[in-house]
Regions:
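Extended amphipathic ligand-handling, pore-lining, and cofactor/metal-binding catalytic surfaces
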Residues: 1-302
Length: 302
């Protein structure tokens, strides 16, 4: 992506990629320290973009990751690290916080779906049910006002429009754990129930994941297709985005647009969930709101 971005946005080049995870290495703390070691921030200034790889925003995913970023920014460059709320020469952060209906993302999903549909005999193709599967959320989070269900639905609808609304489809939810209520219908239940009704041609699309991992390779491939569908040849999974050239171009386009926008984040990022009581979430959003204000002042001055 950065190689492509260097070509399409030479005025902001060179672009250097870093990876940070919440629960695997390299952790956000380690990546932030690496940025400082590489000469970013720590009195040297410089710009960094936190580019979430969750297309659809949720407080449980992107929000949690940004809370972690804000925490380490505060500890390493903020008041706890320097004694100043806005230390001079700190990294100037901005964030690409959501992109559920970006045309490049939609095209990438549609291309992979069309490719998988070609594996069905022509006479069966129009009867394939598309099951868009996303990680579920507890209803307690949804009822707090989390935008995730609406943003996942926006992706699904945009992809179906790109496909000409030619196929039957449903949005289903996977990875529920524990006894509390979660978003439904569950992916596994849906596959089993449709098969009981005689619908055996189904195509699973991991619509909220951008790469393969345990929830695609194990949960969808082994548990849902291998066990719930008993390996029926009509139940297939669309490949994940992974290294799709269309997807990589979409990432570069998103980064370029963001770098030239002068915005620190989307307007939606600043809005808290109506039922949110997290002080860390509030502080994180206030931080990015300040960054956004600084960006606008600098743009106006220029």
């Amino acid at each position: 992506m950065c190689k492509l971005l260097d070509q399409t946005s030479p005025d902001t080049a060179p672009h250097k990629p870093y990876v940070a995870f919440r629960y695997a290495n390299p952790l956000t703390e380690d990546t932030y320290k690496q940025l400082l070691a590489d000469g970013f921030g720590g009195g040297n200034g410089g710009r960094a973009v936190a580019f979430t790889q969750y297309p659809q925003y949720s407080c449980s995913t992107t929000g949690s990751s940004l809370n972690e970023l804000w925490k380490w920014r505060t500890r390493l460059e903020g008041k706890r690290g320097t004694g100043e709320v806005e230390a001079k020469g700190a990294i100037n952060w901005s964030v690409i916080d959501r992109w559920p209906a970006h045309p490049g993302l939609v095209d990438a999903f549609a291309e992979l779906i069309e490719k998988k549909l070609l594996e069905y005999p022509a006479e069966r193709r129009s009867n394939v049910v598309l099951l868009f599967s996303a990680h579920s959320l507890p209803m307690s989070v949804v009822n707090r006002g989390d935008p995730y269900p609406a943003e996942v639905a926006a992706t699904v609808y945009a992809v179906m429009q790109r496909l000409g609304m030619k196929y039957k489809y449903r949005l289903v939810w996977q990875s529920q754990v524990g006894p509390q209520p979660w978003l439904g219908a569950q992916t596994s239940d849906t596959v089993k129930n449709l098969m009981k009704k005689g619908q055996t041609d189904m195509c699973l699309i991991p619509i909220a994941f951008t790469s393969d991992h345990i929830e695609t390779l194990y949960e969808l491939d082994k548990e849902v297709i291998g066990e719930d569908a008993q390996g029926h040849e009509g139940v297939k999974r669309v490949d994940s985005l992974n290294g799709s050239p269309t997807f990589i171009k979409a990432l570069a386009d998103l980064a370029k647009s963001h770098l030239h926008s002068g915005e620190a984040c989307s307007p939606q990022m600043i809005l808290r969930c109506p039922g949110c009581t997290s002080e860390r979430c509030l502080a994180q959003k206030e931080f990015f709101a300040r960054q956004s204000g600084q960006d606008k002042q600098e743009a106006a001055a220029a």
